[in-house]
Amino acid sequence: MTQGGRKVGMPEMVLEYVLKQKGLDVGRDDPTHEVNVRTDVQFDVMAGVFASGQGDYVALFEPTASQVVSMNKGYIVSSLGQESGEIPYTCYSSLKSYMNENKDVLTKFTNAIKKGLEYVNTHTANEIANIIKPHFETNTIQEIETVVNNYKSIDAWPNTILLKEEGLNKLMDIMELAGELDKRAPYDKIVTKEYA
């Protein structure tokens, strides 16, 4: 049994996608399948539920995954991000009217994102860990550095903020496979390259 998180959340849909790409028979909350992905465990308690002995696998974000390892309650066996290939896991959207009326705000916002990506792609794990430490109060610098090294080892951070068409198509493939997308959106209708 595998804990996937909230039904149709990105972690759960990506987990299902990766398992199915590996040829496994996957069911949601259905133990009759080769892999039963539970969606009844709230995301914020998944690590604790797993550590208590429920489930064989769990999909966790960092630094939670590394904390489970440091508590000797599990191992990191794979990265869903690496296994799935490049997908636009985090995207920013706005109404067209907002875009038309606030180009300066969007330019500043996207420039800040670009600057952050440039930083993580050109600095050491230790430098990054020291910068982001205030946002991870319960983690040590060593834990954060381990997480950053894990991300760097799989090229988790892109080199551009541009949402590529291939990435959007893969995201829609994942959503279709999960039964959560009725109609695909045309790339040129929902993505702007103006700020990339």
What are these regions (language model features)?
Residues 95, 164, 192-194:
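Residue-level signal for threonine
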Residues 28, 59, 77, 142, ...:
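A generic structural-conservation signal
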Residues 42-136:
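Pocket-lining segment of extracytoplasmic ligand-binding domains
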Residues 25, 31, 78-80, 124, ...:
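Short, solvent-exposed coil/turn linker segments
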Residues 100-183:
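Secondary-structure end/capping motifs
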